[in-house]
Amino acid sequence: MDPESIGQPWGDAVEGVLTFRGSPTRSWYGKGPVPENPISVWSFPENNRMCSMTSISGVSEQWCGMGWTGQPAIFKYEEETWLIFGAYDSKVHFVNAQTGERLLPDFPTGDIIKGSVTVDPDGFPLVYVGSRDNYLRILSFDGEEPRELWKVHAYDFSPTKWNNDWDSSPLVIDDYLFAAGENSRFHIFHLNRSYDLEGRVVVSPELVTDFPGWDEELISDVGSNVSIETSPLILGDTLYFANSGGLVQGWDIAGLSEGIEPTRVFRFWAGDDVDATIVPDDEGYLYVGVEYERATQRSKEIGQIIKLDPSNPEDPLVWSVEDRPYLNSGIWATPAIYEDLVIFPTDQGKVHGIDRITGDIRWTLELSGKAWSSPAIVDGVMVLGDCSGQLRAFDLSDTSIAPPQLWRVRTEGCIEATAVIWEGTVYAGSRDGFLYAFRDFIQ
C-alpha cells in the first residue's frame, strides 16, 4: 500500500470501513458528516443483551457486549448499508445500519469474539473473523444465512507460544490473507476466491507461509508470552506488526507472488507488551503504544509512547514519551494521526495530543475512565469512548489547544470497543451488552 493511501478508503470496489481502522494502513475512520447533537436511535439486540460465558485462567465468567477492539465493519452491499461485527455473545452479527434489524441470522462460534472483523475489500461477499474458540474463519453472506466456507485452528501450526485466540484483524490484498494469531505466529494464505456455477462465492485457501513472531533473543528477554494481538499494517512492500513481548518488526513481502519467502527487515524491542496496532504517517514513521506490565528496565528507558524510523534500523527511535503511572498501565488504544498531531489515549484515562515532530505533549484531556477505545476522526472531529460508559466528540480544528468537547452520550457499560462513523451516525459497542447507533434527532 502506497504511503499516499494513508487516510484514504481501502480501494474503490466496496464503499465502507472494512476492517479495524478501515484500511491496510489502519488510518481511515469513516465518512461524515459527524452528528452534532446525537441521541441513541437504536440499540442491538432489541431486547436481550449480547452475553456468553468464557474461561479466563480456568475460571468461567460471563462477558457482555463488545470489547477491545470491537469496531464494526460498515459497508454498502446490495443497496443496503450493512454492519457486521462479532461480540461477547460468541456470535457474528449481520445488521441493517439504518434500522438495527438483522439482515441475516447470527453465526455462532464457540467462544467470545474480541477483535474487529474484516470484510473482503474486492467485492466478494466474505467476512474474515477470529474467535476465542481458537478458530479463524471465512464466512459468506450471499445467501439467506451466513455460511462457514473455511476455518483454521491456532494449533494447526507449529511451534506455537502462549495462546490460541485470534484477536487481530486480518488483511486481504491481491488474493492473499494476512493473519496474526495469539499462537504467536504470522500466517499468509492464498485465498483462491471465485464463484461456483450457481453464482455463490467459494474459497480454497492454501497456506503460503507462516513464521514465528518471536526470536530467541526476545524469549531470553521476556519469556514465552509473545502472542500477537496487534492488527497487521502494510505500508509499501513491508508488513509490520508487534507482539506481547514488545517486539516491533517489519517483513519484506515484495516477492510473495513470485514465491519468495518474506524476510525480516526491521526489529525493535519496546520492552513490554504491544497490543495496540502500529500506525504510520505519510513519511513512513511508525507510532507505537506500549503497555507497562513487566516493569523491565528497557520499558523504563524507552517509554510507552514511541516514534520509530524504520528507514534507520540501527537506531530507529526518534522520540519517546513516558506513561507508566502504575504497574499494568500504559497504552492499549491504537493512536490516531491528525495533521501535525499523534493522539494517544491511555489506560489512566488521559488523552495526549503530541507534536509528531518533536514528541512534546501539546495538550492532555482527562476522561472519566480508562481509555482502551481507539480514536475515530472524521471531518476534524474526534470520537472516543472510555470505561465510564461515555462516548465523546471533540473539536480538533485547532491542534495547538486542548480540543473542546462537542457532545457526549452515555451507555451503561465500559466502552473499550472502537467506534465507526458513517454518514451522520456513530456506531459503538459497549460492555453493557449492546451496540448503539447515535445520530441527530430529526423531527
Annotate each predicted stretch with a short phrase.
Residues 1-13, 20, 26-69, 73-167, ...:
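Extracytoplasmic/lumenal domain signature
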